[in-house]
């Protein structure tokens, strides 16, 4: 019988035997009756009146891919070796307890991320009863044991907790401060820094005829010892006695007639005898 399509329920994480006179192990639920409604107590006899219930435990979380799930169930003869990869189902409170003298139940546990199919449910019935949609494993203790297999769900990655630094980078509007508040705090920080600067600092002196400095608007200043000579104030006093000359004044002052050159060029070269 092929596995049925996956269901919304979680796969089984384990099976265990529990004495009928005691509560099931923590995290397990007991199969107390068959599909027909008859009591489902194993091993009940004159020597052992309480008997045992088969208990199931479902996988609680899909976040851990290494969490084991029940991949298969088999019924084997008590004295025969267990199939490869299988382990016996036992009573957690009494590992030596014997449920059946002839047979024993064993399960194959695999990590959730390493199996394609898993067991999702187990039911008990009389030997002549058929349970639709379930695969018959075998007979034990006067009952027919059925299991329902389905496609194993894929592990769900566990969400990571964001640190405060990462939350600061989040685009979630609910966790971000308002734009107006952010601008106000930024302006406040820049204002407090700019208030420590003085207009007579060399970086704010006029470095051109327009009085605009490359440092205007920069919210920090260099330490004086890192300022070079090029940052010193410009001495405009050197231009105080500047005389503006006309074209005629320049031609008169720098007029040169080239008389010597012309005289030398006019001389005849000496004759060669």
UniProtKB/Swiss-Prot annotation:
MABP domain segment(s): 9-151
Tissue specificity field: Ubiquitously expressed except in skeletal muscle.
Location of Phosphotyrosine modifications: 204
Membrane topology recorded in Swiss-Prot or TrEMBL: Peripheral membrane protein
Xref: Pfam families: DUF2464 (PF10240)
Cross-referenced InterPro entries: MABP, MVB12A, MVB12A/B, UMA
Region (Interaction with TSG101, VPS37B and VPS28): 192-273
Motif SH3-binding, chain ranges: 155-160
GO molecular function: lipid binding; SH3 domain binding; ubiquitin binding
Compartments in which it is found: Cytoplasm; Nucleus; Endosome; Cytoplasm, Cytoskeleton, Microtubule organizing center, Centrosome
UniProt GO cellular component terms: centrosome; cytosol; endosome membrane; ESCRT I complex; extracellular exosome; intracellular membrane-bounded organelle; late endosome membrane; nucleus
Biological process annotations from GO: endosome to lysosome transport via multivesicular body sorting pathway; macroautophagy; membrane fission; multivesicular body assembly; protein transport to vacuole involved in ubiquitin-dependent protein catabolic process via the multivesicular body sorting pathway; receptor catabolic process; regulation of epidermal growth factor receptor signaling pathway; ubiquitin-dependent protein catabolic process via the multivesicular body sorting pathway
Key word Nucleotidyltransferase present: no
Modification comment: Phosphorylated on Tyr-204 upon EGF stimulation. Phosphorylation is required for interaction with CD2AP and CIN85/SH3KBP1.
Modified residues (Phosphoserine): 163, 170, 195, 202, 207, 232
Keyword annotations of the record: Cytoplasm, Cytoskeleton, Endosome, Membrane, Nucleus, Phosphoprotein, Protein transport, SH3-binding, Transport
Occurrences of domain UMA (ranges): 215-265
Modified residues (Phosphothreonine): 130
Similarity annotation: Belongs to the MVB12 family.
Function: Component of the ESCRT-I complex, a regulator of vesicular trafficking process. Required for the sorting of endocytic ubiquitinated cargos into multivesicular bodies. May be involved in the ligand-mediated internalization and down-regulation of EGF receptor.
Self-association state and partner proteins as the record states: Component of the ESCRT-I complex (endosomal sorting complex required for transport I) which consists of TSG101, VPS28, a VPS37 protein (VPS37A to -D) and MVB12A or MVB12B in a 1:1:1:1 stoichiometry. Interacts with CD2AP and CIN85/SH3KBP1. Interacts with CD2AP (via one of the SH3 domains). Interacts with TSG101; the association appears to be mediated by the TSG101-VPS37 binary subcomplex. Interacts with VPS28. Interacts with VPS37B; the association appears to be mediated by the TSG101-VPS37 binary subcomplex.
Protein name stated in the entry: Multivesicular body subunit 12A
Gene name as annotated: MVB12A
């Amino acid at each position: 019988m092929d596995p049925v399509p996956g269901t919304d329920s979680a796969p089984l994480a384990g099976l265990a035997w529990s004495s009928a006179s005691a509560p099931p192990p923590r995290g397990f639920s007991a199969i107390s009756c068959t599909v027909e409604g008859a009591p489902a107590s194993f091993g009940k006899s004159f020597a052992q009146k309480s008997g045992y219930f088969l208990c199931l435990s479902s996988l609680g979380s899909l976040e851990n891919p290494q969490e084991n799930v029940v991949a298969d169930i088999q019924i084997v003869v008590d004295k025969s070796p267990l199939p490869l990869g299988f382990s016996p189902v036992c009573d957690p409170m009494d590992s030596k307890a014997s449920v059946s003298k002839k047979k024993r139940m064993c399960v194959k546990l695999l990590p959730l991320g390493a199996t394609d199919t898993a067991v999702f449910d187990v039911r008990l019935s009389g030997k002549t009863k058929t349970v639709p949609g379930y695969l018959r494993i075998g007979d034990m203790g006067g009952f027919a044991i059925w299991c329902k297999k389905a496609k194993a769900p894929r592990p769900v990655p566990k969400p990571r907790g964001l640190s405060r630094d990462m939350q600061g980078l989040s685009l979630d509007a609910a966790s971000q401060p308002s734009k107006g508040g952010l601008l106000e705090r930024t302006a406040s920080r820049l204002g407090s820094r700019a208030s420590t600067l003085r207009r007579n600092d060399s970086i704010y002196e006029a470095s051109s005829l327009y009085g605009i400095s490359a440092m205007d608007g920069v919210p920090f200043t260099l330490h004086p010892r890192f300022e070079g000579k090029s940052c010193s104030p410009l001495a405009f006093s050197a231009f105080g006695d500047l005389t503006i000359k006309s074209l005629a004044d320049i031609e008169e002052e720098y007029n040169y007639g080239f008389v010597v050159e012309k005289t030398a060029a006019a001389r005849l070269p000496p004759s060669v005898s």
